[in-house]
Amino acid sequence: MEKQNKVIIVDYGSQVTQLIARRIREAGVYSEIHPCIVTAAEVAAMSPSAVVLSGGPASVLGEDSPALDKGLLELGVPVLGICYGMQLLAHNLGGELSCSETREYGPADLKFCAGSPLWDGLKTDESSRVWMSHGDRVKKVPAGFTVTGSTETLEVAAMADDQRRIYAVQFHPEVHHSEDGVRMLHNFLFKIAGIKADWSMSSFCERVIKEVSEQVGPDDQVVCALSGGIDSTVVAVLLHKAIGHRLHCIFVDNGVLRLNEVDEVSGYLREHFDLNLTVVDARERFMKQFAGVEDPEKKRKIIGYTFIDVFDEESQKIPNVKYLAQGTLYPDVIESISHKGPSAVIKSHHNVGGLPETMKLKLIEPLRELFKDEVRKLAVELGLPDFIVWRHPFPGPGLAIRVIGEVTEERLDILRKADKIVQNELTASGWYRKVWQGFAVLLPLKTVGVMGDDRTYEHVIALRVVDSVDAMTADWVRLPSEVLERISSRIINEVKGVNRVVYDISSKPPSTIEWE
């Protein structure tokens, strides 16, 4: 079996399995995550250079706990077990486990008990801070293994069988709390597995362009829904390099986009990339649907269904359309498969809200192997400008869910102007690139104020600025008071109809990032 520079990660359900993949890719090595029901034969067909067994919430000693296909240990490639993965190795190879009544969660000081290529370059005469999250523990290592690390409360924190190149750690080297974790992973990849670091956005870009140009027939046409966000924009530019004007981008102006967004994005892409781009002005059509609607779920459905109708109508104007391109990312693929579920790739139209089956289009998902941070790197590789590369996430329903209550042209105008000030001030103060997301929300109430000698009764703007890694959790950002003061002052003075600005200091959970 000819080995490729690829690492297969077998997922046993850990919340940080994706972080293992990202750490490996950051080292310049391609990695894939597969559910723990993947067989050794399936992994062998992928020709990996190494295998990683992830952590997981189950107990190896439990009745229905995820099992190890021992054939994975016969592939002739190095294996690294992390947390649950270490316990699986010990249990299946003749070691002994003990069940703990309480979980060990948090930092621990790792002491190096024996030499190991995993510790290469580390100060083994000193302890190393690592992060633990486990219940069961290895009581006795299997035959052929050596205890290579311990902590004050854990006799076997790491073990190794150098002859079979099987290594295991009870802690999580992939999390940033483990201070030498990245070095340990690099040692596994380069010292133990001898992998060549050849994964880059440049090589990815070349491969995708080649694959798409071969996949799409000479007369086939491809449609792509452009939203102005980074994912769909990268898809469009990448496919344009592969098939040129056979790619048809459709940008639906739904009336709830940011200030000047349609002109800025479409103008730039046409000028610099010569995209075959159609902008559909459907603002009036969407706004009629919003009349009298206050419920956020109804607003979301209006956006989704109306978009589908408009996109379908425009697509049918293009002859010989065979493919739909969309910006599915790797986390979308992973999350669609339970770590216990079938090993299948998704082929759903989730990014565009479920396009009608009558379209009968094949999917092209050029970003389905990438994490969000890799998409940004690819955008830079493709020459996209900072205002697209570093644009904050924007919800599919747009400003419709940032106008709390009924969506009207007047209320949208107020919100757009206020939000533009927020973006400008975050950028001017150097905070825009430091935070995950920052935006304005128009509240469904008015308050009393004083301007000059007159009393006012006008709208309230809420400011929401959060920091996050993946949007699953988020914390409100402690912006400097002078930045908050400038934002508030400018909105009240420059946006007609607003006399109060409040700052949202809620974290997720329990609150969500968006208000609706």
Curated annotation (Swiss-Prot):
Which pathway is this protein assigned to? Purine metabolism; GMP biosynthesis; GMP from XMP (L-Gln route): step 1/1
What's the top EC group for this one?
ligase
GMPS ATP-PPase domain sequence ranges:
199-391
Specify which residues bind ATP according to the UniProt entry for this protein. Answer: 227-233
Asked if the keyword Methyltransferase belongs to this entry, the reply reads: no
Residues in Glutamine amidotransferase type-1 domain copies: 6-198
Subunit note: Homodimer.
Q: What is this protein called?
A: GMP synthase [glutamine-hydrolyzing]
Organism, scientific name: Oleidesulfovibrio alaskensis (strain ATCC BAA-1058 / DSM 17464 / G20)
